[in-house]
């Protein structure tokens, strides 16, 4: 085993279809998973929306911050930085996302950001497909904390096309940083002792 996830916690329509308690990253039931991950040096990838379709503030941020704070020895990859296509159908862009991520990356060294799916546009690239300077600056400030992803599900023939979409953004980064974001950061977050993580419990 190389990691846990993508674990769907708060997730647009999937949350609405869930009976009982809303799935949350800070639910007590997740604690054992986070401990297991830390004990076995496994990263945990969480899908946890930062807000709802309508609220113009990071309404659900606490649900991600609590595990980050309470489990400092667990490495968390925040899928799509808490954004989603459904949120963007109602709010084109979240103006609080960049400052929120800036603060969180400084506060939580165990936080890593997945740039897949809803992150490419409208965040990394503008409407003309040009890299946004403020996002380039954030990635350059934390060059080991971002990684690409495809979020391709069931249509793997489109994988190359999806990954190629990031080329304008990667080309605008210093070469060493681009290599980290495109490949090295993901490899670095995987278990350092693969024999231990693969051993049966």
State where each predicted segment sits.
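Active-site-adjacent structural elements in enzyme catalytic domains
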Residues: 1-11
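Glycine/Thr-rich phosphate-binding loops of Rossmann-like dinucleotide-binding domains
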Residues: 14
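Compositionally biased, intrinsically disordered low-complexity regions
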Residues: 5-7, 84, 151, 193
